[in-house]
Amino acid sequence: MSDWKKRNEDWRDEDELEEEEECECPWVDSKGKVRETAYCQYLLEKHPMMCLKQKLFDQNGEVDEDALLYEVHSDLRDFVLDNLAKKEKQVLDALRIETYTPEWKPQLDRIHLQNGTYFLDERGFVPEKELCLNRLPVEYQPDAPAPTKWLEFLDGLLIPEDILTLQEYLGYLLIPSTKAQKMLIMTGKGGEGKSRIGLLLKKLFGEASHSESILRIETNRFASANLEYKLVMVDDDLNMVALPE
């Protein structure tokens, strides 16, 4: 057999192998065209999501759409030869329609954590995860040692009664409820360490927290939209100017 003929058969084998690999994708038709609905179903089987008011959520809370777009890009780039970016955005739009959820009632009986879900009833902690609006970037560790440095810091900043008040308030923030209708204001001299509590809130709540100015929320009608689906808003530099009536 000549080298040319052997190379030709090798190329043919490679082409046939590529065709077989392409056929393994249930979201690609016989002509190599991506079927958007089938691809959305394929994506949701490995990555369950829901869509609330044009925002996508999964088991970790609000979806990073840049990361999701890259995942779609990685799947489609070998099949879509032209207008790939347009097709990717069309897929995301189709995904929002496919996962449309008209309403999501606040889950007041559980806290979503990195290593599972903590139920406030007799079930306690379970390692399973589910779709949620927020998942805190911390783990539940029942045998964790006492946070001695944090307790020492609070002891030097607040009186014992105020430490209990702070602890109670932080507990309210763990569930998506405004039933208490309370906000926490800490006043004092500069340099005492009050801002560290704000930093702790950002670390504890992650994407479920939002830094914003109360004055801006009062004067900018678009600012409050950033608070939707958040558990806490932190204003670590409160402006003492009177709010407009």
Q: What is the predicted function of each stretch?
A:
Residues 1-14:
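N-terminal acidic, proline/glycine-rich, low-complexity intrinsically disordered segments
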Residues 30, 34, 63, 82, ...:
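Generic amphipathic alpha-helical segments used as scaffolds and interaction surfaces in large
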Residues 35-39, 72, 87, 146-150, ...:
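Alpha-helical structural motif
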Residues 223-245:
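Conserved nucleotide-sensing/catalytic segment adjacent to the nucleotide-binding pocket
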